[in-house]
Amino acid sequence: MTQHAPAFWSLSVTEMLQQLQTAPEGLTGHEARRRLALYGSNRLKPPKRSDVFTLLFAQFKSPLILILLLATGLSFFLRDPVDAFIILTIVVVSGLLGFWQERGATNAVQKLLAIVQIKASVLRDKDRIDIPVEEIVPGDIVLLSAGDVVPGDAAVQESKDLFVDEAMLTGEAFPVEKAVAVLPADTPLGQRTNALWMGTHVVSGAAKALVVGTGKETEFGKVSERLRLRPQETDFERGIRQFGFFLMEITLVLVVAIFAINVYLARPVLDSFLFSLALAVGLTPQLLPAIISINLAHGAKRMAQAKVIVKRLASIENFGSMNVICSDKTGTLTEGIVRLQSALDVEGAPSDKVLFHAYLNAFYETGFTNPIDEAIRTHRSFDLSAYRKADEIPYDFLRKRLSILVAHQGTYLMVTKGALANVLSVCSTAETSAGAVVDIAAVRDRIERNFEAFSSQGFRTLGVAYRNLGTEPRISKESEAGMTFLGFLVLSDPPKANIIETIAALKRLGVSLKIITGDNHLVAANVSQQMGLSNTRILTGPDLRRLSDEALLGRVVDVDVFAEIEPNQKERIILALRKAGNVVGYMGDGINDASALHAADVGISVESGVDVCKEAADIVLLEKDLGVLVQGVREGRTTFANTLKYVFMATSANFGNMFSMAGLSLFLPFLPLLPKQILLTNLLTDFPEMTIATDRVDNEMIDYPRRWNIQAIRKFMITFGLVSSVFDYLTFGALLLILHASQDQFRTGWFLESVISASLIVLVIRSRKPFFKSRPSKYLLMATLIVVVATLLLPLTALGKILGLQPLPISFLLPIGIIVIAYIISAEIAKRVFYSKVKV
């Protein structure tokens, strides 16, 4: 048996079952597990490994760490095994801390993703069960219905009015009908009407299909492999990458220069090399990947408590930076409970005939469950025992109408409902209240006046039409012509009770709401006014079609409501908003929203949305409510703010200390700190920073969107690095010129000053307010105090002696304490000046 039977579309159902060694009732659980082990997970690319050994190795794969370990090994064999062992221990402990934190973050995220896992219905052991799509194997029998994503390349075994959207693979704009068939082996892909392709989705109808290919062996898998598709890089990821390159450039220049000068000054080569490498480790924020993972995972857990599930962690920063949110109105801004207010004839009088025809259409349609058809079916029921469904043309977003064909007393009747203009466009006649059929031109003005009157009151108004087809048992799109207009369906969906407060809350957070709807502009204007959006600026789909990309760019920011919008225009609107410099979120849950979700900086769907949307989304809301989004934005900004804190910490005190040490090493007759002491300094100062994810964030950091600003980070690094260096050199002067410290006393004194000042400065940098006005989290405070106390006690212990530290008299500790206090005060002043001049 091989995966993906050759030209499976040319085989009969029986031949395919034999080829894949399966049965119409599906595989057994045992056989499915065997095939999963044989063919692998049903993914386009293997999942990022997060097992224990992979994560552990990741902590030590930095080139700097690997070189340091190599140099330590040389030191072990050549000169000083004790020092080498100490350095090795510090590196391992640092790596284990990062591993422990990142492992916890990974596990937490996997649990959250399981909440919104995409599943497929399959037959296993003759029972219908839902399993994750990753577990689908060749030979599985899958059961599909409207809204489902096809989980693998498959052959149709049974179908009922099955229409599939293949645009993402073939570019075909209209849904394609699929049915059981045997086709020639050389049939082009777009004409294989018995084949289903992974990644496409069902628009209407239902099917039972045999999976013949999964993962990379699918048609879509081959395309994505050739193109090497990867998620679009976010601003946050780009910023982190640029920041990493920036630090590496500084580190490389500084370390090479220090090593060369120390060798020139005739100092031991190995000592100089280890010192330079230790400086490099101190300059480089080794824990940055772990801290980011911890921060994002912690933020994802907090967002989950707010009923917001993050599928792609890097999107959290974009979520916090978002300043425009685009959304449909139905169910998000409105109650989502559509009610049929009335069924009216051409004159606007109540009509049971219009209601009955609408009921026929809604009862027999097999597309994705929608609130309009549900409203029609529940408004009033009719006895349809004398009717039989014969055919269907499903709704699509270009025709904007749905037609069904029913058999009744030996004749066939086609009933169409949909957007009024689109229904009118296929009508040549209309039926009056008296039952007379007249030319459509005679009543068109009256129809349009009624439509405008209903729309201006906020009612969504559809048209209903019919056509007698005699003995014709099938229909196609061409059949939608020469129809008779019957009347109107008037529907309501009022705004949510709390929507005005929710929109105001978003506005206070600096997020503007733009409504994108297929409803006509009159309905959209009325609803937007009910939601408190006064002086609404509206752009319609037809107007949008006439605008060039440049013209749209000039208008898109000022428009509040986009009405009468076609699905392909949603993506164009999103891209224009992004090009105008906005961070754009798009909230959608319908079959036609997938491309817009992909185009947005943050794609947001809801748990109740169709699979194709949940698959495309970065973030999934467990409730379809903008109020949930408000809390999610706050949590996203909290996560970004805490990540930025670590970056600021890593580029201030640590950078200043290492820069000072590099400079001083050129003038001292001995190394200012031993390599093991530098690494210990780095380890101790990293400890409080590991708790940053739990820290509180001031309201002013949440109140408006912020974006990654590498220039501001560089300015921060220079400003606070210089402040740190000034006090480092004051420490040097006090130790050497006033206290006349010995070599070990100097190293101990500076070790104390470096670690304590770098730990305490965290409390200053974490907030824009004075540190005593912004309370840190208890974990950050405890970690800082533990490090300060441990640092003070370390020289008094046997371990301190091994590390080259010695107890200092009070005459040394007092000036060091004064310098640390002066440094904290100066940093507070520098912080105030910095934020008054630089926007971060």
Regions found by a protein language model. Name each.
Residues 254, 258, 531, 535-586, ...:
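Membrane-embedded transport module
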Residues 163, 169, 180, 335-357, ...:
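Basic, amphipathic juxtamembrane/active-site segments
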Residues 195-203, 318-485, 491, 504, ...:
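Cytosolic catalytic regions of ATP/NTP-dependent phosphoryl-transfer enzymes
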Residues 66-86, 246-284, 297, 301-307, ...:
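Helix-interface capping motifs at the ends of transmembrane segments in multi-pass membrane proteins
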Residues 83-117, 124, 231-324, 489, ...:
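Hydrophobic alpha-helical transmembrane segments
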Residues 58-77, 91-95, 99, 118, ...:
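Alpha-helical transmembrane segments of multi-pass membrane proteins
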Residues 1-128, 134-137, 142-150, 155-163, ...:
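Non-lumenal N-terminal regulatory segments of integral membrane proteins
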Residues 41-73, 106, 128-129, 186-195, ...:
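Soluble-to-membrane junctions at the N-terminal ends of transmembrane alpha-helices
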